[in-house]
Amino acid sequence: MSSQSPAEGLQFPIHASIKKQSTSLTGQEILSEALSIVDNKTAQQILAEKNWRKNYPIYFKALVKHGITNSNNPITIAKQGLHKAHHLFDYYRDGKHYLLKDALHIPTSTPLNTVKFKGESEAAPEWYVPYKGQKLSGQSLLDQIQKWENAGIIEPSHAKALREAAAHPEWFDLSDRTMVLFGAASEAGPLPWLARWKANIVAIDLPNPRVWGKILNTIQQGNATLIAPSIEKIDSSAKASALRDKLGANLLTQIPEIAQWLVQFPQKLDLAAIAYLDGEKHVRVSMAMDSIMQYVSEHKPDTSLMFMCTPTDVYAVPKEVAEAAQEKFKSRSQLQKMAVKGVSTLSLKRFFQAPYQDLITSENGKTYGIADCLVVEQGPNYALAKRIQQWRATLARHQGQRVSINIG
């Protein structure tokens, strides 16, 4: 990626050595800084890496490995990585250049206005699990949970959480929660569920009639309340058809406006980082969300954070999970082994490798495996965007905030 004259908003930095933007160099600098204290040798290797787009998984796995060995390492890694990122990315406003870390303090000439829109449904909040065309709830859900657990499809802790949710339908009345959705219209986001659970939904997404038509339609059919930003003052009686052209805020260009708008809310806020963009924009929008989350958390310490991580990443898992996966791998039928061997050979041994090949003992006395599910073809930008979110989650939890991570 290169650019002669950076556009407005959050941008990758221009590197002095090549006099242009480089997503690879930026990623290498951030990961190197993240590892610099816990493993300086690998940190230097990252900076010297000549084939970053192919070899980046090695270094993302190193982050996890060092995070396992010592309970202080994940905090150190997260602090170092985020600090570097906030001092590296640029922000442009009216032709002036700022470091991202300073963007939140830019005076806003056009503050955002608040628009509310209530859903028309009177239905009570309801939760079920969609499965094979059915909506499982009650005893049918409990029976299916038991089948999944018996078959090893879900872990016991997962089964326990589902049973608890089924036993407490009152949990799904969210009329006392104010939930901020960055990238509210995201296909993988929780908007359709929250719209049925009486939540107060602060929706942030691009000013785009198609996007807001979708959001407004979802809210209108549910029992929730939409709270949306607008640069215009809008009459409270405005209908959905009129609102769709007037709502929205851009996470990449309106960072200070969004952050300063959110801290004005008197309610506790639950911030959900679910915005997704393709390629290098995904890193930028992750950094934008991180900047806003950090700012809001500093001004409202009772704020909670939520992230949607990806299964195609690297994670530490308990020893029991790793050993169960190893046992299943060993107990495959002969036909399965032959088929897998063929695919593995054709893919130059990139697919269907034995899981959790190494178990690592931490200084806390526990043993962990590493679930290495990175897909090289997704690229280092995607991996970095997701790592930024994990770092913020790790650091926020360490600092006493409530944090939720879902992988899916």
Task: Put a short name on every predicted segment.
Residues 156-175:
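A short, basic/flexible loop-to-alpha-helix module at the beginning of a structural domain
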Residues 243-245, 249-317:
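Extended alpha-helical scaffolding regions
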Residues 2-4, 212-265:
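Extended charged low-complexity segments that act as oligomerization/scaffolding linkers
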Residues 306-408:
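Long, contiguous domain-sized segments
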Residues 1-66:
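Non-catalytic protein-protein interaction scaffold segments in large eukaryotic complex-forming proteins
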Residues 176-191, 195, 202-205:
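Glycine-rich adenosine-cofactor-binding loop
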Residues 44-157:
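Low-complexity, highly charged intrinsically disordered N-terminal segments
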Residues 198-203, 220-225, 264, 290-307, ...:
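Structural alpha-beta junctions
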